[in-house]
């Protein structure tokens, strides 16, 4: 795994816009529009494919698979498992968003099953979800975290080892735990959690960068954090933030990303 630095992150943004990778999303009803538009604004190509009948074809030519369990049910679960099998067969990364893990036994069980099955895995979650994945007691209110991101770093280290993956913890401070290093990013804005699907957007962008290279979640976290920060400065509230975020992702340039990014690496 490459140790990420600001120059590498900037180069990945340029490469994504050049390659325009296709990202397969099995995601929830609430955020499909948000995440598809964010992927398009950044320069990727989203497809919201949920049918098991076409998944083998989709994974043969796409760049990565995003699985979001936000509106989980008995119909979606086998489709998700089959999609992971196809991603493994095609050596594609799987980005898992274990929405509400810890809030119900079903969500926790399915999240762990997917994490166990995926060969090339990145987990993007809030602190409570990461702690629940690790098997510890977490405080959650539905799909929202009541634990702070820094309190979940130890659990993230355990999860990263258990599933041989990278773990992205979203919060006031974002943390990424890989097999080789830990990263801390201090971008973003306090208004961002008031837009539904912001974490799901984070997961989708992680899938886009995973489709073009050696992504662990650091690049997507950096890009969304800086873009969200800029968009919030131009917004009166969550409604305008949602629109301004798309514009900022579309307009984000290398100089702005380099200048504003607050990244700490512990290798």
Curated annotation (Swiss-Prot):
ATP binds at residues 124, 170. Its EC number is 2.7.1.50. One of its GO terms (molecular function) is ATP binding. SUPFAM superfamilies: Ribokinase-like. It is an enzyme of class 2 (transferase). One of its GO terms (biological process) is thiamine biosynthetic process. It comes from the Bacteria. Pathway: Cofactor biosynthesis; thiamine diphosphate biosynthesis; 4-methyl-5-(2-phosphoethyl)-thiazole from 5-(2-hydroxyethyl)-4-methylthiazole: step 1/1. Substrate binds at residues 48, 197. Belongs to the Thz kinase family. Catalyzes the phosphorylation of the hydroxyl group of 4-methyl-5-beta-hydroxyethylthiazole (THZ). This is Hydroxyethylthiazole kinase. It comes from Aliivibrio fischeri (strain ATCC 700601 / ES114). The lineage of its organism: Bacteria, Pseudomonadati, Pseudomonadota, Gammaproteobacteria, Vibrionales. The gene is thiM.
């Amino acid at each position: 795994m490459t140790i990420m630095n600001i120059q590498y992150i900037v180069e990945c943004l340029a490469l994504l816009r050049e390659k325009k990778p296709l990202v397969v999303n099995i995601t929830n009803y609430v955020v499909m529009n948000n995440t598809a538009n964010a992927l398009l604004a950044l320069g990727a190509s989203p497809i919201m494919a949920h049918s098991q009948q076409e998944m083998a074809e989709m994974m043969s030519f796409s760049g990565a698979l995003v699985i979001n369990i936000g509106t989980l049910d008995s119909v979606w679960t086998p489709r998700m498992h089959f999609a992971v099998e196809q991603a493994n067969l095609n050596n594609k990364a799987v980005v898992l968003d274990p929405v509400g893990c810890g809030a119900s036994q079903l969500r926790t069980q399915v999240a762990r099953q997917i994490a166990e099955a995926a060969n090339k895995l990145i987990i993007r979650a809030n602190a409570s979800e990461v702690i629940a994945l690790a098997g510890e007691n977490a405080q959650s209110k539905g799909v929202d975290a009541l634990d702070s991101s820094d309190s979940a770093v130890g659990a993230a280290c355990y999860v990263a080892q258990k599933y041989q993956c990278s773990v992205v913890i979203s919060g006031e401070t974002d943390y990424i735990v890989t097999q080789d290093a830990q990263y801390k990013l201090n971008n973003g804005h306090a208004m961002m959690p008031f837009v539904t699907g912001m974490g799901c957007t984070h997961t989708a962008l992680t899938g886009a960068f995973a489709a073009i290279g050696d992504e662990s979640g650091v690049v997507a976290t950096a890009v969304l954090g800086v873009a969200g920060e800029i968009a919030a400065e131009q917004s009166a509230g969550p409604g305008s933030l949602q629109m301004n975020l798309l514009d900022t992702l579309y307009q984000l340039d290398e100089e702005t990303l380099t200048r504003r990014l607050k990244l700490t690496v512990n290798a």
